[in-house]
Amino acid sequence: MDRAPAEQNVKLSAEVEPFVPQKKNLDAFVLPMALPSDNGSVSGVEPTPIPSYLITCYPFVQENQSNRQFPLYNNDIRWQQPSPSPTGPYLAYPIISAQPPVSTEYTYYQLMPAPCAQVMGFYHPFPTPYSSTFQAANTVNAISTECTERPNQLGQAFPLSSHRSRNGNRGPVVPKPQLLQQHIKNKRPQVKNVATQKETSATGPDSRSKIVLLVDASQQTDFPSDIANKSLSESTATMLWKAKGRRRRASHPAVESSSEQGASEADIDSDSGYCSPKHNNQSAPGALRDPASGTMNRLESSGCSGGVNWPKVTCQATQKRPWMEKNQAFSRGGRQTEQRNNLQVGFRCRGHSTSSERRQNLQKRQDNKHLNSTQSHRSDPNSESLYFEDEDGFQELSENGNSKDENIQQKLSSKVLDDLPENSPINIVQTPIPITTSVPKRAKSQKKKALAAALATAQEYSEISKKSCRKLYQKQLEKTKTPVQLDLGDMLAALEKQQQAMKARQITNTRPLAHPVVTTATFHTKDSNRKTLAKSQPCVTSFNSLDITSSKAKKGKEKEIAKLKRPTALKKVILKEREEKKGRLIVEHSVLGAEEPTETHLDLTNDLPQETVSQEDAGLSMPSDASLSPASQNSPYCMTPVSQGSPASSGIGSPMASSTITKIHSKRFREYCNQVLSKEIDECVTLLLQELVSFQERIYQKDPVRAKARRRLVMGLREVTKHMKLNKIKCVIISPNCEKIQSKGGLDEALYNVIAMAREQEIPFVFALGRKALGRCVNKLVPVSVVGIFNYFGAESLFNRLVELTEEARKAYKDMVAATEQEQAEEALRSVKTVPHHMGHSRNPSAASAISFCSVISEPISEVNEKEYETNWRSMVETSDGLEPSEMEKAAPCTHSPPEKPSRLALDTSLVGKQLPLAAGSITSAPSQGKPTGDKDELKPDDLEWASQQSTETGSLDGSCRDLLNSSITSTTSTLVPGMLEEEEDEEEEEEDYSHEPTAEEVQLNSRIESWVSETQRTMETLQLGKALPGSEEDSAEQSGEEAAEVPEGLESGADSETWTPDQPPKPSSNMGKEHPDSSSPPQST
């Protein structure tokens, strides 16, 4: 035909006659089309059988069309075939009201709107290039008019761009002035059309006549001007026709490539279904249908973004689709779809297309240009080019938005992921996703495994806690409010969770890694992810991609908000003790601050040194309690209640052992460890566990049920303990840095129970790695305290090596402990020698003072020098003024007994002063600081002198009469709680400080006592102890405590018999009694 009227401002190829359908039936989605004959006349209503290759390539035609003749695959007529010879393009034209005939060269069958993909135009191979210009614009107008007239059979307006995409629904095209059409056409030349027939653009920088031999016979210029003038929103039917874009989808890449490469359509066979240059040029008319802002925008952007005119897309889709499907497994739901969408989107007026679609089109085109160009050239003219699938070719028609989303995802996966580093979590997660990217299933499974390992490693080293993950995720949500981003994060989170644990049930563990992905691949997940995941990972795709609120893929009956786990009994104990420790620290600091200034009180002073000692030795923050037994106070584990399995209850409570343990062990090397830690053991354990985990995982991949029945490992104290009771564990690996929880039912008890069971069952138990490292070895993100090995078959060499290393480490540990104990014993001896007499009484380590705390407290008294005991006894007698009345009463009868007894009693009293701290556990003495004042009056200096003389005469301190005087002496000044040996030691110190005053006042005492007092004064001056009274009291209390433990009752009677004579001043003794009557017992400088 001749050029269209100028009014149309559209140059159409005169060679192509508009295709006229046999009859126009609005009800039918696709009607048999009358194809223009070569002479330009529309062939009669009689349908011409379509070549079988066309039918084969396009099997998916709606069968529900009543009007339509269904061609059999054996050359039956599916659409009316144009009379022209195959040389002319075979074009199925959308049923549009007859328009000015288009040259037969361009017979174009446009898709009829149908729920399923409508019949696509098939193009017969047309060897001759299209020389004629585009059909007159009026033809286009007529076509568009018919399209407009044609109701949307589908009831959905399919945007031009969405023909292929399942998102095809678009608003009806709004008619726009033909000027727009003109303008669009002018710009059309700017947009490189894949197939450009000899076209003359009315206006435009690119206006030039191109002769492109596009085998595609579809001519979009055949649309009626009405349609061309209408915008996408107005002409919904046109949009439906534009569904032809599906064909174009396949050809679209070719269109882009050929247009950009400048390849003429002559290069493409007509069979391939490429659009003729007319169609490319007339895609503008198709766009003109959108012509308003839509078409103009699209055409304008078509050069950059779409560039693919609607007819062009159709032709290209037809041609490229087949080979692309072959070449790319994912083309159906993947990039081809994207290309098709891009073409269609571009074909759809840019104004109508969403900004995201335009961007997607641009990106898709950029990504696909190379593919399209190569594919368009590679595409064969045979039926492959015409191969279509309903799902693939018409995804957009069937599912709106699916193909577009898929296209977006494909684009992102190809473009975004390619830019990312290979080891990035996003890349790792995405690699298994594009199943449609022609990746074999085997490769996919391998990638999944590799992904799981990579994710596990990445997250294990990152050690992101769930809280931090949630915070990260919330931040991501705040920053990226787009639902797609949320969906993507959730998808990736689910993927990571599943693969990181290498088990679908562990999806929740790897969620954090999804967050970095959220921002990078925003559009990634809607449909294509959903589809690909549905194939590979059905559990991940259970969520609704349209639901913005669904933050993560759900598995089974998993709750959106995970219900907090109730803490187990062990966890409750751990949490409780943690709180107690915090409280103790606070109380300790406050108590220490209060006690240091108030050392005058015997109780406080007694507690303080023990607190410091126990804290130093045990490393615990718990102050020693006066009510505790000496063993508990001496032990480094003076926490109440002490667990049965704790070291305190397992014989580690001796001072030497406790100091050794505290010196060797630390938080990272707890006391329950009985072997030395070494890198060799750690490496061996790591290899062994990783090997066993790999065995278990391999079995799990093959047969999950069997894998569960034949587990290799078990993690956790609870599980390990349970299986050890069942005698199923072959080896136990314990982390040496478990938290110290010594309360009953706490962590220490659980660990000692495990060790005890292992010893009973003769199971090797190894201390290696830290809790976090142990967790990593078994592919866990959380710390693991204990790992039990059910079966090490297959890794016997590693296991045997581990056992050998462990035995060597135990030997090394024993040697280390022995060496440390020896060193400490030597240090204790040196410290005892250097201790001042008033502090250590110049005796063996049995002085039990706070300084010599680690010495053997229970040293027999027989080893002590007699002189020391005599002097101590005398000093105690001096302080006996402060004896309680009851004690004095008890001591009196003893003293009245024959002289042998009194002498022994006196000696015993002196011994008691020294023994008191040692034996104080047996004595319960009430604070007698106030009482001694009254008691001292009862005691008389004569009796004391007599007792002292007896003691000097006898001179033997065998302790036979310790009973009587011991209790009285101890009770006088020491308020020691029974069993408080350390308190007695403290008393000794205070007695030393205190003793010099009372001794100065006492004049009539024995010469030895006087000498002792002078010596004590000198020592006090040298030490410059401001608190002399308390120190002396401590010493006397120690001595009295020693004897009091042995003879608690005898002291009081002896005290009664011995009463002070009025000649002697009672005050000094009373003062001594008040403050620390035991001052007499403290160390003798002699």
From Swiss-Prot:
Keyword Cell membrane in annotation: no
UniProt function note: Binds SECIS (Sec insertion sequence) elements present on selenocysteine (Sec) protein mRNAs, but does not promote Sec incorporation into selenoproteins.
Comp. bias intervals (Basic and acidic residues): 355-370, 933-943
MF GO annotations: selenocysteine insertion sequence binding
Gene name tied to this protein: Secisbp2l
Naturally occurring in which organism (per UniProt): Mus musculus
Keywords noted in UniProt: Phosphoprotein
Bias-annotated ranges (Acidic residues): 981-994, 1032-1046
Database matches in Gene3D superfamilies: 3.30.1330.30
Protein name, UniProt field: Selenocysteine insertion sequence-binding protein 2-like
Keyword Transmembrane belongs to the record: no
